[in-house]
């Protein structure tokens, strides 16, 4: 198996320098599973498959236990009742845990070595090649030369969706080139409308995230200079302390 990374391994928006790591939540006990599934389906607006949601929720605890058994121990929150521990899509506190970026790099880096995965960092995918109706390899740019890698199958496990947009809150190295390559060979991007969009400042600090908790100190005006939220202001202030933005 060959793993190609456009930058260094463990890079991109997921490892953005301004973030500490990854937060994850689990049902707060067996009785919380149904509520978590309902919360996911509410945000899904009818697009989420109930059976898939149920399988996802039931798989969280076993997945975390598997990490623990293999040596990656999530951190527990000191004060679990802080509003910051409510996920952006959710409506209540659950069992919050965290994984630091450094712990993830060490753990998964070792796993890749143990599985004899060959890593090609700083390598750019240029195109996929086909034989008949099947992908049979990839053309890449690596160490100042173009290479063809023959392969029985290719998995594009890539992020970069923010690169589809002119205004984005990610670093400039985030690219959507792989999505163009996938489109070129017949794949389609679906459910783009369910991406999480975060508001950002236009000025004076373009590219800075506007956190939902800043709503309570903000005055929002329409094009005529009139206040947008005179009615139900207290309700909007309460909602602004948690996600998702669609409810704020």
Task: Tell me what each language-model feature is.
Residues 2-4, 161-162, 166-169, 177-180, ...:
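Glycine-rich phosphate/pyrophosphate-binding loops
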Residues 14, 47-54, 64-81, 188-191:
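A short alpha-helix-loop-beta-strand transition element characteristic
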Residues 22-56:
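Glycine-rich active-site loop/strand segments that organize a redox cofactor
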Residues 49-58, 71-74, 232-233, 241-248:
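N-terminal leader/propeptide and maturation segments of large enzyme subunits in energy/redox metabolism
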Residues 7, 151-153, 157-162:
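Glycine-/small-residue-rich beta->alpha transition segments that form the dinucleotide
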Residues 60-145, 153, 157, 198-203, ...:
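Conserved redox-cofactor binding core of oxidoreductases
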Residues 1-17, 28:
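Glycine-rich FAD pyrophosphate-binding loop
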Residues 181, 187-248:
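An anion/pyrophosphate-binding glycine-rich loop and adjacent beta-alpha core
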């Amino acid at each position: 198996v060959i793993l190609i990374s456009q930058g260094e391994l463990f890079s991109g928006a997921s490892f953005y320098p301004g973030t500490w790591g990854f937060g994850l939540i689990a049902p707060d006990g067996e009785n919380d599973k149904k509520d978590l599934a309902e919360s996911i389906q509410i945000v899904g607006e009818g697009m989420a498959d109930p059976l898939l949601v149920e399988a996802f929720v039931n798989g969280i605890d076993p997945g975390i236990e598997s990490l623990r058994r293999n040596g990656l121990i999530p951190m527990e929150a000191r004060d679990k009742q802080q509003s910051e521990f409510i996920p952006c899509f959710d409506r209540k506190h659950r069992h919050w845990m965290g994984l630091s970026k450094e712990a993830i790099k060490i753990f998964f880096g070792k796993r890749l070595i143990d599985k004899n995965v060959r890593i090609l960092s700083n390598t750019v995918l240029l195109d996929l090649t086909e034989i008949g109706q099947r992908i049979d390899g990839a053309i890449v740019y690596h160490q100042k030369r173009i290479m063809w890698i023959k392969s029985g199958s290719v998995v594009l496990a890539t992020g970069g969706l923010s690169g589809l947009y002119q205004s984005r809150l990610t670093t400039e190295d985030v690219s959507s080139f792989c999505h163009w390559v996938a489109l070129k060979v017949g794949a389609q991007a679906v459910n783009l409308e369910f991406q999480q969009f975060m508001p950002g400042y236009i000025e004076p600090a373009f590219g800075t995230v506007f956190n939902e908790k800043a709503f309570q100190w903000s005055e929002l005006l329409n094009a005529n200079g009139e206040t947008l939220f005179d009615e139900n202001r207290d309700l909007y202030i309460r909602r602004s302390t948690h996600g998702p933005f669609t409810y704020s």
